[in-house]
């Protein structure tokens, strides 16, 4: 972060702090029995973990290495609201979802690391004494970078064998990369017998993606994967790293619709949007405002000075400033049980991303339009960086079956099939617990 932290308005820090004044931890009230559907998913996950352990033994042998085979998991995440605010030190409201990356791992007696990816059908091998970027197996760099970051944190990592699998769709904006990083961290720390506080682990995983993989991501993805709680979204302050659990309505499901479009312009356009936000801050400082980031600008303050900003920069700044306000209002609405209000905020967020930040695409717009025409949908918006990927929808549990039957049929009638890289998909999700070691009953 910049060193001119004192330049931010002190009043903004209190106005834009975590509602309720959360400290470093997330304090949760116990929830009632989650119901048979959740229990069934947990049983299915345990069966998958036992299967993965058997694949591990078939791959590496029963008694090779040292110690037991450990199975860990880390979830993907969906951002409910708060898009392109994280790198502006703003606010986000993600939820960990019940799609995850699983790793079976066992320590070795040397410094060699072997990783078998079932999704890619590939195996890589390297030594902890010489961790280098792999241009041929790019998926493995999330593993390599995470192990390197943990070693830099002082974790006494042994060599290890891993088998990795996952059902988080890649490239869809659901943070499959963060899930792989976090699962790697949990697995490595488990076999090393080394404890790392959840936030520290998330920050190490972010460091791996920033420094080793060279993707300039914010903290949201890793925080959600580590700190997620079943039945809750996480309100995250991307400046202070404070988080608060926000209860989600039990009678609603998170439904993710994959447009089938992958984000060809994402990297260049993402970098452009980020530079435009930085330009806005520089220009606002030139007008005498003491701001460190767009997080420090209120809608009223922006309205007074936005005429001085170039048109594109003005639009980007307006989105970020108003999106931060939408996140804060969303937290209040969800805490008060005002689902319809939260849904309206989701729709407003999508319109802002489409018209002001200009990161939507015809397919995302079509998916949102179709979803909002189906009964039982409280809200819908694009989620992720944009230019393709997924929408997130809040759908009443009684309407989910009809939604699944209807949404893709109507969507495919509205879009050009030649633009689709993959078959569109619908994923019905619930907010899930964050990463951890799995306990398997024999």
Each model region followed by its residue ranges:
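C-terminal nucleotide
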Residues: 25-26, 32-77, 81, 102, ...
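Glycine/serine-rich anion-binding loops at beta->alpha junctions
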Residues: 73-78, 82-89, 167-184, 376-394
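Short Gly/aromatic-enriched secondary-structure transition segments
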Residues: 89-96, 273-274
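Hydrophobic alpha-helical hairpins/lids featuring a short glycine-rich hinge
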Residues: 123-157, 161-168
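Fold-level recognition of mixed alpha/beta catalytic cores in primary-metabolism enzymes, strongest
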Residues: 173-256
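Acidic, glycine-rich active-site loops and adjacent beta-strand->loop/helix elements
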Residues: 77-78, 99, 109, 119-122, ...
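A short glycine/serine-rich beta->alpha loop
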Residues: 68, 87-91, 128-136, 166-174, ...
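Phosphate-handling active-site elements
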Residues: 152-161, 188-204, 396-410, 414-418
């Amino acid at each position: 972060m910049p060193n001119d932290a004192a330049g931010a308005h002190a009043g903004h820090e209190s106005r834009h702090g975590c509602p309720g004044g959360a400290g470093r931890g997330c304090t949760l009230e116990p929830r009632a029995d989650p119901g048979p559907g959740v229990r069934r998913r947990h049983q299915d996950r345990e069966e998958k973990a036992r299967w993965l352990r058997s694949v591990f033994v078939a791959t590496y042998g029963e008694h090779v290495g040292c110690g037991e085979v450990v199975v860990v998991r880390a979830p993907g995440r969906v951002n409910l609201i708060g898009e392109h605010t994280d790198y502006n030190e703003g606010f986000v409201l993600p939820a960990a979802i019940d799609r995850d990356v699983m790793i079976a791992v066992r320590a070795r007696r040397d410094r060699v690391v072997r990783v078998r990816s079932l999704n890619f059908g590939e195996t890589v091998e390297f030594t902890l004494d010489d961790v280098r970027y792999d241009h041929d197996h790019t998926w493995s760099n999330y593993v390599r970078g995470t192990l390197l970051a943990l070693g830099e944190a002082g974790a006494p990592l042994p060599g290890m064998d891993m088998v990795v699998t996952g059902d988080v769709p890649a490239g869809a904006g659901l943070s499959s990369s963060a899930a792989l990083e976090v699962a790697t961290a949990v697995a490595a720390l488990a076999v090393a017998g080394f404890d790392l506080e959840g936030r520290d682990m998330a920050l190490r995983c972010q460091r791996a993606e920033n420094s080793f993989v060279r993707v300039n991501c914010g903290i949201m993805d890793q925080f959600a994967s580590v700190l997620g709680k079943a039945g809750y979204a996480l309100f995250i302050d991307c400046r202070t790293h404070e988080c608060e659990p926000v209860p989600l309505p039990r009678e609603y499901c998170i439904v993710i619709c994959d447009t089938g479009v992958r984000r060809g312009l994402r990297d260049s356009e993402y970098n452009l949007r980020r530079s435009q936000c930085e330009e806005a801050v520089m220009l606002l400082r030139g007008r005498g405002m003491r701001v460190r980031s767009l997080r420090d600008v209120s809608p009223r303050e922006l309205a007074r000075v936005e005429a001085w900003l170039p048109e594109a920069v003005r639009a980007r700044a307006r989105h970020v400033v108003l999106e931060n306000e939408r996140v804060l209002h969303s937290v209040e609405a969800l805490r008060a049980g005002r689902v319809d209000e939260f849904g309206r905020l989701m729709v407003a967020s999508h319109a802002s991303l489409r018209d002001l930040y200009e990161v939507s695409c015809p397919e995302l717009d079509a998916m949102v339009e179709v979803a909002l025409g189906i009964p039982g949908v409280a809200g819908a918006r694009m989620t992720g960086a944009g230019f393709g990927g997924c929408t997130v929808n809040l759908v009443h549990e009684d309407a989910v079956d009809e939604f699944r039957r209807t949404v893709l049929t109507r969507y495919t009638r509205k879009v050009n099939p030649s633009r689709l890289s993959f078959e569109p998909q619908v994923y019905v999700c619930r907010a899930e617990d964050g990463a951890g070691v799995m306990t398997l009953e024999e």
